[in-house]
């Protein structure tokens, strides 16, 4: 396997580096985008109970804000409850945008890797074919082994680039969809809390 990678030439180094970075980002995103960590169950009902009991003090709001991304969004609304429904919603939307931006962390890295690794493979193909034609000019086409190195590099780098790019793009799309779903759920929970606190929902 190592010999196969080595025969791809120096362009295998950035392709392998991209694959390692991609694997690290995918593992980190799987760990970070855990639905139970981001949108814990029963958070809105617990806020409602504290609100009805008059126990939503500054300490509990700070604790809520640090508990999860959803808690941070809801806390932004609770802090501005006394300023009316519209200000409360605006605060929630602002916090929601910040949280959504944080959830998208490293996704651009995956998108970039998915875009550049096929290009690196293509560059390897071009370099390999240049070597083939240079060998033909120097030695003719009588000895196939003279051409083997260039053809091998041309094929291996292309295959390696696509091998990294295809799963990376799949995970990029998967994480993008998961983030969209989490943002929609946070918006729904925040709206529910606003309506409950303003007496529009039980």
Q: Model-found features: residue ranges?
A:
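Membrane-interfacial hairpin junctions
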Residues: 3, 136-138, 143-148
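Alpha-helical transmembrane segments of integral membrane proteins
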Residues: 12-25, 111-118, 164-168
